[in-house]
Amino acid sequence: MEKDIKLVEQVATFKRLPKSDSRWRVAFYYIAKEFWDLEEVFVIIDKTLYEEQGLKIPVFREYKEAEGFQIFSSYIKAREFVEKQGDLFVAANGEKLIGRIRQSAFREVFVPFFAEQNFNYLLNEDEALFVDTFKRLLAVMEASENYIVDQEQEDLLKAGDVQGFFADICKKYIVLM
């Protein structure tokens, strides 16, 4: 929870800086660092794909001129977002479609894969919303661009089945809350 609060404070500071201010680079670094250091992140699961195909695929949404995966720094923020949306992210059985990704899976699988695919992320919501690329997150954290895969995932990648690979990592590493 403390990391989440610190992250929100960093985003708020960043948003107050004028675009001409050189301190934005430092503020950005601290946001990326706090985000990278979260023990777990939370995603909202696409209701249609979950109910029709049993897939736990994170929501990919648009914000202003950017599109990206919606990621939350805490379960509370994810739950508040889901509750504001009515039944849009609630399964027929009443289950809120919120998934958790542990730090190791996020760092070692999701971020490098999303960076390779040139995806963005939208962190949190409302006044704490921050948008950036996974590629820049990897670069700032000086992390490896290689992602860890098991044999089944390696076979999917060798066959060129990127969608199958993505569905598999979501199935294995996203836990519904």
Question: Language-model segments: what does each one mean?
Answer:
Residues 1-177:
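An interfacial alpha-helical scaffold signature
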